[in-house]
Regions:
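Active-site-adjacent structural elements that line small-molecule/cofactor binding pockets in enzymes
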Residues: 1-243
Length: 244
């Protein structure tokens, strides 16, 4: 999708829902995007495309007439005619040091997933380094976490939910270039319960989950979005709302 279309959609949502919309961007996954039959670039090029796209989105959010001639995208003179009262913040999904630094330079915040504390600290520092190089205040940069978990009434059920519904949580390799759900299905057969260790908390104990969430808040995350991988969503929301 051309970044101009993304910018228009984002600006329209922000105009409709003032203060409630932010734009999250990433470098993509083949599983979702190869189906249109276009060229699927290697990771470095996808990242470069993403940052050029952000440049275009930023220009359009200014409300001025915009023209762009870049390495990957072109834009004839145009502008966004529907602008929100508040420009939506742009958050980038990433987990690598080089991309994290550039995210600090160009974006308003970072989205990442649960990881060991040492890696999280590295990502934080690279983002703050990028902020300083760009002349912006690192204190205004937002860190957002998507935390996968599996909760159920018993540990056995929680593990079964993880194995059945979210086996990719135990896959210890990059998955961005996998093109077919059938390939995922075959790879999922290789996942064992121990593969989730240190990658996703699987527990029936709400207090264990509360401690896990608090651990990431203590690291410095501003927001933590929870993803319970099982289908027991209503029960999970009730229990976590009451006990976590």
């Amino acid at each position: 999708m051309h970044p101009a279309i993304v910018a228009q959609a984002s600006a329209t949502l922000a105009a409709m829902y003032t203060g409630r919309h932010w734009l999250g961007l990433g470098s993509g996954e083949a599983l979702n995007e190869h189906i249109v039959g276009g060229y699927w670039p290697e990771t470095p090029e996808r990242i470069a495309r993403m940052f050029e796209a952000i440049e275009i989105v930023r220009k359009l959010f200014s409300g001025k007439d915009v023209k762009h001639e870049g390495k990957f995208y072109k834009l004839e003179t145009t502008r966004l005619w529907t602008l929100p009262e508040q420009t939506p913040p742009i958050y980038i999904a990433t987990a690598g040091p080089i991309t994290a630094k550039k995210t600090g330079m160009l974006a308003d915040g970072l989205i990442t997933v649960g990881a060991p504390e040492q890696k999280i600290e590295m990502i934080f520092e690279k983002c703050r380094e990028g902020c300083r190089e760009a002349g912006s205040d690192p204190a205004r940069f937002r860190f957002i976490l998507q935390l996968h978990l599996s909760w159920a009434e018993t540990d056995e059920e929680a593990l079964r939910n993880a194995m059945d519904e979210w086996p990719n949580g135990g896959m210890k390799f990059p998955k961005q270039d996998i093109r077919s759900p059938f390939d995922f299905e075959q790879m999922a057969k290789l996942v064992r319960p121990e593969d989730f260790t240190g990658r996703m908390l699987i527990s029936s104990d709400p207090e264990a989950h509360r401690r896990e969430i608090q651990k990431f808040l203590d690291m410095g995350f501003d927001q933590v979005y929870l993803h319970n991988v099982g289908r027991n969503q209503a029960q999970w929301i009730e229990v976590f709302g009451r006990e976590v």
